[in-house]
């Protein structure tokens, strides 16, 4: 896989072309950012751990019937995935109050909800990813009504699967972000879960102590960022023997 053609580089990942036009390589970087890139650093090993954790979780979701872009783990930093045209909407599922949600509604971090809350954000760095309503999504034709309803159902199903999985290893899934898309050059494609599921995209707390095991360790200057990521990987037993 030498001299790979770079298709796209984001804050946390690089996408490379392959010989198959329907598949790409997703490479995980060590960069970490917060507050819409206003805060940034290099956390050595982060990309490796996120690659392992996301690969592990995607495979678990596939086993439960969720369609994802994941194909296979290639090496410590890379995975082979289906080439997806991403829908410009981030789906956030909240099980407990945390972060900006707590500030917006002036409630304590860790307050549980009677049922999960689903929020939608428009993926646009220049606009700081504004929160949008279902009306916005339909009016701007980012999704059809049928697709929107399917994403809500899929998101809640994914939440149930991941919440149970994390609970079984002593971790609370506080909230997390999902991205969906369609197969490249296929407008009639079904919806696929894409991007990653990792401590970069999830809030994960130790069940017993509420110790934060995710990107909040960086956002909130708690220190030992990589230790939180390592703890998640080890609790999940997500590091394979390559």
Swiss-Prot record:
Listed pathway(s): Purine metabolism; IMP biosynthesis via de novo pathway; 5-amino-1-(5-phospho-D-ribosyl)imidazole-4-carboxamide from 5-amino-1-(5-phospho-D-ribosyl)imidazole-4-carboxylate: step 1/2
GO biological process: one example: 'de novo' IMP biosynthetic process
An example molecular function term from Gene Ontology annotations: ATP binding
Keywords, alphabetical: ATP-binding, Ligase, Nucleotide-binding, Purine biosynthesis
Reaction equations catalysed: 5-amino-1-(5-phospho-D-ribosyl)imidazole-4-carboxylate + L-aspartate + ATP = (2S)-2-[5-amino-1-(5-phospho-beta-D-ribosyl)imidazole-4-carboxamido]succinate + ADP + phosphate + 2 H(+)
Similarity-based family: Belongs to the SAICAR synthetase family.
Name of this chain's protein: Phosphoribosylaminoimidazole-succinocarboxamide synthase
The keyword DNA repair belongs to this UniProt entry's keyword annotation: no
Record-linked InterPro entries: SAICAR_synt/ADE2_N, SAICAR_synt_PurC, SAICAR_synth, SAICAR_synthetase, SAICAR_synthetase_CS
Gene Ontology terms: cellular component: cytosol
Pfam families per the UniProt record, alphabetical: SAICAR_synt
UniProt-listed Enzyme Commission number(s): 6.3.2.6
Highest classification ranks of the organism: Bacteria, Pseudomonadati, Pseudomonadota, Alphaproteobacteria, Rickettsiales
């Amino acid at each position: 896989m030498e001299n790979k053609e770079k298709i796209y580089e984001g804050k946390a990942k690089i996408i490379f072309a392959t010989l198959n036009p329907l598949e790409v390589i997703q490479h995980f970087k060590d960069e970490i950012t917060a507050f819409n890139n206003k805060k940034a650093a290099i956390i050595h090993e982060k990309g490796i751990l996120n690659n392992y954790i996301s690969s592990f979780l995607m495979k678990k979701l596939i086993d439960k019937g969720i369609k994802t872009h994941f194909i296979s783990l290639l090496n410590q930093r890379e995975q082979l995935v289906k080439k997806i045209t991403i829908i410009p909407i981030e789906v956030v599922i909240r099980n407990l109050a945390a972060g900006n949600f707590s500030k917006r509604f002036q409630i304590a971090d860790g307050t549980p909800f009677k049922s999960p809350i689903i929020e939608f954000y428009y993926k646009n760095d220049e606009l700081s990813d504004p929160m949008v309503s279902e009306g916005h999504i339909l009016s701007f034709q980012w999704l059809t009504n049928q697709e929107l309803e399917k994403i809500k159902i899929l998101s809640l199903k994914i939440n149930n699967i991941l919440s149970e999985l994390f609970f079984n290893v002593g971790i609370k899934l506080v909230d997390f972000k999902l991205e969906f898309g369609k197969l490249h050059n296929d407008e009639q494609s079904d919806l696929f879960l894409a991007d990653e599921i990792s401590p970069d995209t999830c809030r994960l707390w130790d069940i017993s102590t509420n110790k934060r095991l995710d990107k909040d360790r960086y956002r909130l200057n708690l220190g030992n960022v990589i230790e939180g990521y390592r703890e998640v990987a080890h609790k999940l037993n997500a590091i394979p023997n390559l």
